[in-house]
């Protein structure tokens, strides 16, 4: 991990490894450059190469050689993007980010040939790129990028451990503070307060409550309700806190103010046994 930054950042050696691997894949696919597209909810490939978690929209121009350029929206997001990113050349994307990226390709002499496209690009933006680069062949490189990201480095595993630790904090807070008389909205507050001050961010906090002896839900809800928790309820959870894009995940049920019913205890015991059996699956096993 890079220790001289105000924000979490991987080491220069880690980014060098990523760039080398990605460029080897580009060469194999015959690509001169990549256009890596990201938005607030879908930005993993942009962050993987730039360290910047996209706040609205961003396009990374990533050439086969030379320095990349990161275009971000909005104008007032540029100063922070320059602090967070490992990319030296960070610019505002102007009125249309795709137009700025296309112009950058022209300046580099990369407006023709095969260009890799990474990410889920809205039709309007794709049509703009297609129309502005009639001599270029646009090739979807998303799957290849995702394949490269599947195998985590030692530094990434440390970030995942941090995400897991933050997720554990959330569950521990629920164990302490979940009680009859509070609402599901208050459960969300308990969860987030456990990790926000530690540099964590919310990834998901799905939760639901229901009477154990007369249940009406069987899975955590994606949106909390104003239901007031009662004695004899079960709280079911799916919690993922993230550390700079690297989340943990933990699922735990809680019996509120009473012992678990026979049915819920049986389901819990089966879940624990299933989880423990994962340890017997050897590396390299397939889904069969």
Q: Can you say where each PLM-predicted feature lies in the sequence?
A:
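Active-site neighborhoods and metal-handling regions in enzymes and metal-associated proteins
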Residues: 1-288
């Amino acid at each position: 991990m890079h220790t001289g930054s105000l924000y979490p950042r991987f080491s220069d050696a880690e980014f060098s490894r990523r760039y080398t691997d990605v460029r080897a894949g580009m060469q194999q696919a015959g690509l001169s450059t990549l256009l890596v597209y990201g938005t607030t909810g879908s930005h993993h490939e942009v962050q993987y190469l730039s360290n910047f978690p996209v706040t609205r929209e961003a396009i990374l121009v990533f050439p086969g050689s030379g320095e990349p350029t990161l275009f971000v929206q909005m104008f007032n997001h540029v100063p922070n993007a320059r602090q967070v990113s490992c990319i030296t050349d960070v610019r505002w994307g102007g009125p249309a980010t795709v137009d700025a990226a296309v112009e950058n390709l022209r300046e580099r002499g990369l407006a023709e040939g095969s260009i890799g496209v990474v990410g889920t690009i809205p039709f309007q933006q794709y049509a703009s790129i297609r129309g502005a680069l009639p001599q270029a062949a646009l090739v979807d490189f998303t799957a290849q990028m995702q394949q490269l990201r599947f195998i985590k480095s030692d530094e990434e595993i440390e970030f995942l451990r941090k995400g897991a630790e933050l997720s554990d904090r959330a569950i521990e807070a629920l164990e302490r503070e979940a009680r009859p008389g509070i609402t599901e909205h208050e459960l969300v507050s308990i969860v987030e307060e456990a990790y926000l001050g530690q540099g964590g961010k919310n990834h998901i906090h799905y939760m639901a409550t229901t009477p154990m002896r007369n249940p009406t839900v069987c899975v955590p809800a994606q949106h909390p309700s104003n239901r007031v928790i009662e004695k004899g309820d079960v709280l079911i959870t799916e919690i993922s806190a993230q550390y700079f894009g690297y989340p943990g995940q933990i699922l735990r049920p809680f019996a509120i103010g009473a012992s678990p019913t026979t049915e819920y205890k049986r389901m819990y015991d089966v879940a624990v046994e299933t989880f423990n059996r994962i340890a017997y699956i050897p590396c390299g096993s397939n889904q069969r």
